[in-house]
């Protein structure tokens, strides 16, 4: 899975530690493979479909339709086809990599069409692909069973401009909010009120069909109103909330966006549906994979190798460079005091950090987390430590790399000149952070992790390996 593994590993005594960090990353991503997890959650026996414990008699429906999208859409749809075969009448899903097959056993799709969109900024081809999804939703009636694919990344991959809004309006607003460091909840509050699909609108479009959603969660806490901007879930945000988000992050949107939000706040545009709305009476959504899925697999690998696993949290959030300081402090504390766990140990965390763009470089939350950790860590450069921080979809912040593998030797202070690969001066690291160019610095140090699209998305995964010989300066 990690394409540049050999370049990431050195020939010194730390190679086993670095190798374990990469093994843990791979195990976490593979555990969240949508084909695998959906195959375990879905079963068809004697004409009855069971999804995560809920049963549906296929004889009660005249048509079975698959629709939706996201980074994990292909694997999810493939598992549904493997289970139901020709019981699926038609379908369409949208993803950023239509050829993605993270699980070698996942079959090519036959009943469901895969269409391409773009992430993290929506595109025209995404709009065209989403129209097909909405056509299927609009055609559903009370005799239809809709199997809805709701996975991380669908907020951008399924753009459906509401009312008179244009794609350009959505693009400009999305780019500005991403650059501002807005949280996913705040970003989605705006998205939901500018979309004909998000914030429960897809549930409205499919009603009165029976809808079974399968969600691969990429959000902290697995809030179904946030995953993919909650197309099948009640929305408790309002047009007024969306306006406050823009003000909070000092984002000046296109006039059409501002006009729509203003009219909505005045009650001239209908709000997104809330809990108790009839649109949700025949809708159920099941989370089949999340950050916990990946973290559990990492912990198992650690135990197998004789390292005690310690989960910090599956809900780490906030500025990436600030969150990195806590992980640096833990790495320093463990060898000195045995707290919060005695080495050798693997400290792991998930969640979703953000980056407030300060310059014109290239980077993402996991790259910035890794670079900030390497700059902040107060440990001997020869300490037996390694940190891998990746986005499980294989693309951190739209950079084309998954994240980075770093150690206490990655950044050296003045007077200890960089020598060999995997070395950066502290000045270079600080300049890169100031210019939001964590990728540039880490790529030069041969520290960027390259996986390509993984076909899943359960957000950030961080693995800190602390060996027995680690020690602070």
What are these regions (language model features)?
Residues 1-67, 75-76, 82-83, 312:
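An N-terminal, well-structured beta->alpha segment
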Residues 81-87, 106-113, 161-172, 207, ...:
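A glycine- and small-aliphatic-rich helix-loop capping segment at beta-alpha/alpha-beta transitions
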Residues 94-142, 191:
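Glycine-rich oxoanion-binding loops at beta->alpha junctions
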Residues 165-183, 235-251, 359-387:
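Gly/Ser/Thr-rich active-site loops/lids in small-molecule metabolic enzymes
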Residues 178, 185, 189-251, 440, ...:
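A glycine/threonine-rich phosphate-anchoring loop and its flanking beta-alpha core
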Residues 235-324:
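Accessory alpha-helical/coil subdomains and C-terminal extensions
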Residues 292, 296, 300, 304-384:
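Active-site segments that bind and position negatively charged phosphate/pyrophosphate groups
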Residues 363, 370-473:
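Internal helix-turn-beta structural module
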């Amino acid at each position: 899975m990690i394409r540049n593994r050999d370049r990431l590993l050195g020939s010194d005594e730390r190679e086993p530690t670095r190798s374990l960090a990469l093994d843990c990353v791979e195990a976490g991503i593979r555990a969240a493979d949508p084909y695998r997890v959906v195959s375990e959650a879905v079963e068809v026996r004697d004409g009855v479909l069971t999804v995560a414990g809920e049963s549906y008699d296929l004889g009660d429906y005249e048509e079975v339709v698959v629709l939706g999208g996201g980074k994990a859409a292909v694997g999810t749809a493939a598992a549904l086809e493997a289970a139901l075969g020709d019981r699926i009448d038609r379908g369409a899903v949208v993803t950023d990599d239509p050829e993605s097959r993270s699980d070698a056993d996942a079959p090519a799709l036959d009943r469901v069409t895969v269409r391409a969109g773009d992430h993290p900024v929506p595109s025209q081809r995404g709009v065209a692909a989403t129209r097909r999804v909405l056509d299927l939703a609009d055609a559903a009636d009370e005799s239809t069973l809709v199997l809805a694919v709701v996975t991380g990344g669908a907020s951008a991959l399924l753009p459906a401009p509401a009312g008179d809004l244009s794609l350009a309006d959505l693009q400009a607003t999305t780019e500005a909010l991403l650059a501002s460091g807005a949280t996913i909840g705040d970003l989605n509050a705006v998205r939901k009120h500018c979309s004909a699909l998000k914030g429960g609108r897809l549930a409205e479009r499919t009603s009165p069909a029976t809808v079974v959603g399968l969600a691969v969660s990429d959000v902290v806490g697995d809030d179904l109103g946030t995953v993919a901007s909650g197309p099948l879930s009640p929305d408790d945000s309002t047009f007024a909330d969306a306006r406050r988000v823009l003000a909070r992050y000092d984002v000046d949107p296109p006039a059409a966006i501002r006009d729509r939000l203003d009219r909505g706040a005045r009650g001239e545009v209908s709000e997104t549906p809330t809990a108790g709305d009839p649109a949700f009476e025949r809708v159920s959504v099941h989370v089949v994979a999340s950050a916990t899925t990946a973290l559990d697999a990492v912990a198992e690998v650690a135990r197998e190798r004789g390292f005690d696993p310690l989960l910090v949290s599956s809900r780490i959030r906030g500025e990436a460079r600030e969150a990195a300081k806590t992980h640096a402090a833990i790495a320093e504390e463990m060898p000195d005091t045995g707290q919060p766990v005695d080495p050798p140990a693997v400290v792991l965390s998930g969640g979703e950090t953000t980056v407030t763009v300060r310059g014109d470089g290239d980077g993402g939350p996991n790259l910035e987390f890794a670079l900030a950790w390497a700059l902040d860590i107060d440990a001997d450069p020869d300490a037996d430590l390694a940190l891998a921080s990746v986005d499980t979809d294989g693309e951190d912040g739209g950079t084309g790399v998954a994240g980075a593998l770093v150690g206490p030797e990655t950044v050296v202070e003045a007077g200890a000149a960089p020598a060999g690969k995997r070395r950066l001066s502290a000045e270079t690291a600080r300049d890169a952070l100031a210019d939001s160019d964590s990728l540039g610095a880490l790529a030069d140090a041969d520290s960027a992790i390259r996986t390509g699209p993984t076909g899943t998305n359960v957000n950030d995964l961080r693995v800190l390996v602390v060996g027995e010989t680690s020690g602070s300066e």
